[in-house]
Structure formats: C-alpha cells, structure tokens
Amino acid sequence: MATKNLAEDPYEKLANAIIVQASKDYMSNLRKKKRNPGSASAEHDIKECERFFRSGWYQVLTSVDGEYLMNRLRKEALGTK
C-alpha cells in the first residue's frame, strides 16, 4: 500500500500557495504604509490580510497560528526585532 505524500497533494499545494500570497501581500502593504503613512489603500489591504489571517478559512488551510505569522511577517517587513 502506497503512502500519501502530503507535499505532492494538490490541495495542500493550493493551501500553501494561498498563504504564501497573503503573506507577500501583507508584507508589501506594511512596507508601503511605512513609506507612505497616509496611504488609505495600504491600510485597507493590511486590514484585509489581517482579517484573513484571523479567519476560519485560514485555520482550515493551515495549523500555523495566524497571530504568530502576522507578528513574524511584521518584524521581517519593517525590520524590527
């Protein structure tokens, strides 16, 4: 009986791709807001990403804590410790 390799599961790949794209979007908008603090579009997109990372849909896609991930992404995007 063959074992299932989750790394090759197309649904797992899709879930990972969704999270990776949301992470890139979040970091990009954090940097945009840092360069231009008055950017309403960056603020809107940041809130949208944060809503996703706190959503039930996010929890279906991964077991990684959304708050933990947002904190890590913020530190990386803004160069803070």
PLM region spans:
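Short intrinsically disordered terminal tails
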Residues: 1, 78-81
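N-terminal acidic leader/helix
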Residues: 2-39
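Short, charge-rich amphipathic interface segments used for partner binding and complex assembly
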Residues: 40-78
